[in-house]
Swiss-Prot record:
Pathway: Amino-acid biosynthesis; L-proline biosynthesis; L-glutamate 5-semialdehyde from L-glutamate: step 2/2. One of its GO terms (cellular component) is cytoplasm. It is found in: Cytoplasm. Its main location: cytoplasm. It catalyses: L-glutamate 5-semialdehyde + phosphate + NADP(+) = L-glutamyl 5-phosphate + NADPH + H(+). Catalyzes the NADPH-dependent reduction of L-glutamate 5-phosphate into L-glutamate 5-semialdehyde and phosphate. The product spontaneously undergoes cyclization to form 1-pyrroline-5-carboxylate. Belongs to the gamma-glutamyl phosphate reductase family. InterPro entries: Ald_DH/histidinol_DH, Ald_DH_C, Ald_DH_N, Aldehyde_DH_dom, G-glutamylP_reductase_CS, Glu-5-SA_DH, GPR_dom. Keywords: Amino-acid biosynthesis, Cytoplasm, NADP, Oxidoreductase, Proline biosynthesis. GO terms for biological process: L-proline biosynthetic process. GO terms for molecular function: glutamate-5-semialdehyde dehydrogenase activity; NADP binding. It comes from Acinetobacter baylyi (strain ATCC 33305 / BD413 / ADP1). This is Gamma-glutamyl phosphate reductase. NCBIfam families: PRK00197.1 (NF001221), proA (TIGR00407).
Length: 421
């Protein structure tokens, strides 16, 4: 069986590499035509896709998947329309491929610049949500990349049905159908093959739980664009405007709990804690948020607040639970964020410009917010359109990864017969 999986994955990789060479030189017009053809194919295949999803949902219920996982797995007609709208949004995005920047003449007479190009072949590994299949496929195609998609086994039938429609659209548009492939086996050995096929795959993008991403990071022989956690912080400075601080702290935690840009720890300057904490605690109580605080937080709010442990400062709850720490000054807040945070998104609320500059310079995160909710750390909110993920790495892409994050740059040189002396 292992040999057959290896042979299957090698064939998938070879086909993807071949298709990527065609896509790399495809015009914007050609790629948009293909995306439009995929849109039409998806509309025509909607009954089959929803029926396949119903099969996955029933299997999930029979396997006793938890309700949150089932919710992410389900495709309703409304969610399907949302997927189609996301595809239209990608069509409307500016194509970064072929863009030439930084043109300048050198003393030798040559003209030097940079040109944006596709990465090549992307391997995408993700869980549960079938809408990711279309999001990732459309972003890859628009940026001139081939993509190999390995969704969770719980969504296998949904993903196969979506892929059938996508490949039909590619054929109609005259592009190679293997530009977008879904791995059609639930065997985990396929993942092991995908993340080590250095001759065929240029980058791996994992989206899912911490254990999945840790495994991919540890075992991959190919560069990985990833984030492990979204342990985000909001620091309420002594010079914060509480008319801003209260709604920001409430929104960052309670707008959505199970997302990577939700706040997990609230830091409050000691000189404003007596005034701020009782007011924000009342708002959290209305939302049934469990509070876990340091000793000073519990002194102010009372023993109904649970004692925060060292583990709490590291935890991404993805739930209505919040850790709260009172700090002496901005330096202690920054030190806490850089020690316990996940380099995802962190915010300060203050009216002091010098503290703003200090926070921006010293907080080591992919997104740093000033007087705004951490929930804005999102490709759509950043004007990137859809995103393939959010990276907390520092190499290549950092923060929400949209079209440009799926590209690289090559140096280009224009000469007129120059030789080097």
């Amino acid at each position: 069986m292992q040999d057959s999986i290896e042979q299957y994955m090698q064939a998938v990789g070879q086909q993807a590499r071949k298709a990527s060479r065609v896509l790399s030189s495809a015009s914007t017009h050609t790629k948009n035509n293909a995306l439009s053809a995929i849109y039409t194919a998806l509309v025509n295949h909607e009954p089959e896709i929803l029926a396949a999803n119903a099969v996955d949902m029933q299997k999930g219920r029979d396997s006793h998947l938890d309700s949150a996982l089932l919710d992410r797995l389900e495709l309703t007609p409304t969610r399907f329309k949302g997927m189609l709208q996301g595809l239209k949004d990608v069509i409307a995005l500016t194509d970064p491929i072929g863009e030439i920047t930084d043109l300048a003449y050198r003393p030798s007479g040559i003209q030097l610049g940079k040109m944006r190009v596709p990465l090549g072949v992307i391997g995408m590994i993700y869980e549960s949500r079938p809408n990711v299949t279309l999001e990732a496929a459309s972003l890859a195609l628009k940026s001139g990349n081939a993509i190999i998609l390995r969704g969770g086994s719980e969504a296998l039938q949904s993903n196969k049905a979506i892929a059938t429609a996508i490949q039909h659209g590619l054929k109609v548009a005259g592009l190679p159908e293997h530009a977008i492939q879904v791995i059609e086996t639930a065997d985990r050995a396929a993942v092991g093959q995908l993340i080590t096929m250095t001759e065929y795959v240029d980058v791996i993008v994992p989206r899912g739980g911490k254990s999945l991403i840790e495994r991919i990071s540890n075992e991959a022989r190919i560069p990985v664009i990833k984030h492990l956690d979204g342990n985000c912080h909001v620091f309420i400075d002594v010079e914060a405007d509480l008319h801003k601080a209260l709604p920001i702290a409430l929104n960052a935690k309670t707008h959505r709990y199970g997302v990577c840009n939700a706040m997990e720890t609230l830091l409050v300057h000691e000189e404003i804690a007596e005034e701020f904490l009782p007011r924000i605690a009342e708002l959290y109580a209305e939302k049934h948020v469990e509070l876990r605080g340091c000793q000073e937080t519990r002194r102010i709010l009372g023993s109904s607040v649970k004692t925060a442990t060292e583990e709490d400062w590291y935890t991404e709850y993805l739930a209505p639970i919040l850790a709260i720490k009172v700090v002496e000054h901005i330096d202690q807040a920054i030190e806490h964020i850089n020690k316990y945070g996940s380099h995802h998104t962190d915010a300060i609320v203050t009216e002091n410009y010098s503290k703003v500059r200090k926070f921006l310079a010293e907080v080591d995160s992919s997104s740093v917010m000033i007087n705004a909710s951490t929930r804005f750390a999102d490709g759509f909110e950043y004007g990137l359109g859809a995103e393939i993920g959010i990276s907390t790495d520092k190499i290549h892409a950092r923060g929400p990864v949209g079209l440009e994050g799926l590209t690289s740059q090559k140096w280009i040189v224009f000469g007129d017969g120059q030789i080097r002396h």
